């Protein structure tokens, strides 16, 4: 079931109207910036988007302008990732085709106040279907800070979560 939902949503993401997507991205960025978890955070982790995903660069720029420390993920092994400081001059394309830091010092989970979590589909309980690698579920399993995700309306789907799935605390959608 997860595979069919993932495939259908990825197809919908690929064909979405670019202007409408950009408008929704701006609206969701404003909602994150007004969110109490973001307001209280000193260190914010997000992701560098694939073309079809929520454009997190507006969030990154706003967080930097507000003096917050911004982190992005780096894959360090099968199913394993860490968060490193965002430095656009140090980004390289990863095996998965997304940008990630070339190098840097991993930031301890306890020092991350908010993680902006990507996903392909989310159910009404905050559980997500990702791209299938389990990176975020493993990382979030013992993470104690705040989590938030941003998705488009059509990414909301009902499915049963599995034992290893970790929900996000809040999902913002447009």
Labelled PLM ranges:
Residues 1-100, 104-106, 110:
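N-terminal active-site beta-alpha-beta segment that forms phosphate/nucleotide-binding
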Residues 2-4, 11-15, 110-115, 123-127, ...:
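Surface-exposed, charge/polar-rich loops and edge strands
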Residues 46-48, 117-118, 173:
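Redox-cofactor binding/interface segments in oxidoreductases and associated redox assembly factors
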Residues 49, 120, 151:
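Short glycine-/small-residue-rich Rossmann-like dinucleotide-binding loops
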Residues 61, 130-135:
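Charged helix-capping and loop-helix junction motifs
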Residues 95, 124, 128-132:
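Short glycine/serine/threonine-biased micro-segments
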Residues 118-119, 132:
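A short beta-strand-loop-alpha-helix capping motif that often carries His-Thr
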């Amino acid at each position: 079931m997860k595979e069919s939902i993932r495939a259908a949503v990825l197809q919908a993401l690929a064909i979405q109207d670019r202007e409408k997507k950009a408008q929704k991205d701006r609206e969701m960025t404003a909602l994150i910036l007004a969110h109490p978890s973001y307001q209280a955070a000193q260190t914010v982790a997000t992701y560098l988007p694939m073309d079809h995903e929520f454009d997190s660069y507006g969030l990154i720029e706003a967080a930097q302008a507000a003096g917050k420390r911004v982190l992005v993920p780096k894959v360090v092994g099968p199913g394993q990732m860490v968060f490193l400081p965002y430095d656009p001059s140090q980004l390289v394309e990863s095996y998965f085709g997304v940008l990630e830091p070339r190098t840097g010092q991993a930031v301890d989970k306890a020092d991350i106040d908010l993680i902006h979590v990507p996903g392909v589909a989310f159910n009404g309980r905050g559980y997500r279907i990702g791209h299938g690698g389990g990176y975020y579920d493993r990382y979030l399993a013992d993470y104690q800070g705040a989590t938030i995700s941003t998705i488009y309306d059509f990414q909301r789907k009902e499915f049963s979560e599995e034992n290893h799935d970790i929900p996000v605390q809040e999902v913002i959608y447009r």
